[in-house]
Amino acid sequence: MYAVIKTGGKQYRVASGEKIKVEQIAADVGQEIVIDQVLAVGNGAELKVGTPLVSGATVTATVVAHGKHDKVRIFKMRRRKHYQKRQGHRQQFTELQIGAIAA
């Protein structure tokens, strides 16, 4: 069984037992969270698509860790004007262990 969930402005296809990295969630490590924004639920050949959400469907997940992604380097330059700007960014994430999918 799998589900398509929405969290942090992004959509993820998840199945029971998977680990995924999502945008940072304000929850402690080891805490169990319930994601109720389920866009679709599938089981083999059967697919249930919500309009926009599947009513009554939830996905439970456990917070495994918090961290930062690799650094993304930004470099801006104007040719012949002696202008260079360097900047870096590390996006924070939360790693989730997907538990039960209830439709």
Swiss-Prot record:
<dbReference type="InterPro" id="IPR036164">
    <property type="entry name" value="bL21-like_sf"/>
</dbReference>
<dbReference type="GO" id="GO:0005840">
    <property type="term" value="C:ribosome"/>
</dbReference>
<keyword id="KW-0689">Ribosomal protein</keyword>
<dbReference type="GO" id="GO:0006412">
    <property type="term" value="P:translation"/>
</dbReference>
<dbReference type="InterPro" id="IPR028909">
    <property type="entry name" value="bL21-like"/>
</dbReference>
<dbReference type="GO" id="GO:0005737">
    <property type="term" value="C:cytoplasm"/>
</dbReference>
<dbReference type="InterPro" id="IPR018258">
    <property type="entry name" value="Ribosomal_bL21_CS"/>
</dbReference>
<keyword id="KW-0687">Ribonucleoprotein</keyword>
<dbReference type="InterPro" id="IPR001787">
    <property type="entry name" value="Ribosomal_bL21"/>
</dbReference>
<keyword id="KW-0699">rRNA-binding</keyword>
<dbReference type="GO" id="GO:0019843">
    <property type="term" value="F:rRNA binding"/>
</dbReference>
<comment type="subunit">
    <text>Part of the 50S ribosomal subunit. Contacts protein L20.</text>
</comment>
<comment type="similarity">
    <text>Belongs to the bacterial ribosomal protein bL21 family.</text>
</comment>
<keyword id="KW-0694">RNA-binding</keyword>
<protein>
    <recommendedName>
        <fullName>Large ribosomal subunit protein bL21</fullName>
    </recommendedName>
</protein>
<comment type="function">
    <text>This protein binds to 23S rRNA in the presence of protein L20.</text>
</comment>
<dbReference type="GO" id="GO:1990904">
    <property type="term" value="C:ribonucleoprotein complex"/>
</dbReference>
<dbReference type="GO" id="GO:0003735">
    <property type="term" value="F:structural constituent of ribosome"/>
</dbReference>
<dbReference type="Pfam" id="PF00829">
    <property type="entry name" value="Ribosomal_L21p"/>
</dbReference>
